[in-house]
């Protein structure tokens, strides 16, 4: 799996933006990716030092359109803590 396939997109929420000020970034990642793979991908793609990673599996929600019921896909979220004083400049403009 390519490093660019592991990182899907940054999480866009108020809580994620508040974490950016403390050097904590949140990303949606491939559900099959492991913590060492995620760490290597973040370090190589953004050129930063990752100090810690927390991951969580987010189950898909039940959605309904009229009488038809379906489910959103299950996702995996990674919360990445960077070394002191480091930032991901590509995401700083979004906050």
Swiss-Prot record:
Keyword GTP-binding found: no
Alphabetical keyword list: Ribonucleoprotein, Ribosomal protein, RNA-binding, rRNA-binding
Keyword match DNA damage: no
Cleaved signal peptide residues: none
GO cellular component, one term: ribosome
Gene Ontology BP annotations: translation
GO molecular function: rRNA binding; structural constituent of ribosome
Oligomer and partners: Part of the 50S ribosomal subunit. Contacts protein L29, and trigger factor when it is bound to the ribosome.
Similarity comment: Belongs to the universal ribosomal protein uL23 family.
Function statement: One of the early assembly proteins it binds 23S rRNA. One of the proteins that surrounds the polypeptide exit tunnel on the outside of the ribosome. Forms the main docking site for trigger factor binding to the ribosome.
Annotated NCBIfam families: PRK05738.2-4, PRK05738.3-2
Protein name: Large ribosomal subunit protein uL23
Source organism of this protein record: Deinococcus geothermalis (strain DSM 11300 / CIP 105573 / AG-3a)
Encoding gene, per UniProt annotation: rplW
């Amino acid at each position: 799996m390519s490093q660019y396939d592991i990182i899907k997109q940054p999480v866009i929420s108020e809580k994620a933006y508040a974490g950016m000020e403390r050097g904590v970034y949140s990303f949606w990642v491939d559900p099959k990716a492991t913590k060492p793979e995620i760490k290597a991908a973040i370090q190589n793609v953004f050129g930063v030092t990752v100090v810690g990673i927390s991951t969580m599996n987010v189950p898909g929600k039940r959605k309904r359109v009229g009488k038809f019921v379906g489910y959103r896909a299950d996702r995996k979220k990674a919360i990445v803590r960077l070394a002191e004083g480091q930032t991901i400049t590509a995401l700083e403009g979004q906050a």
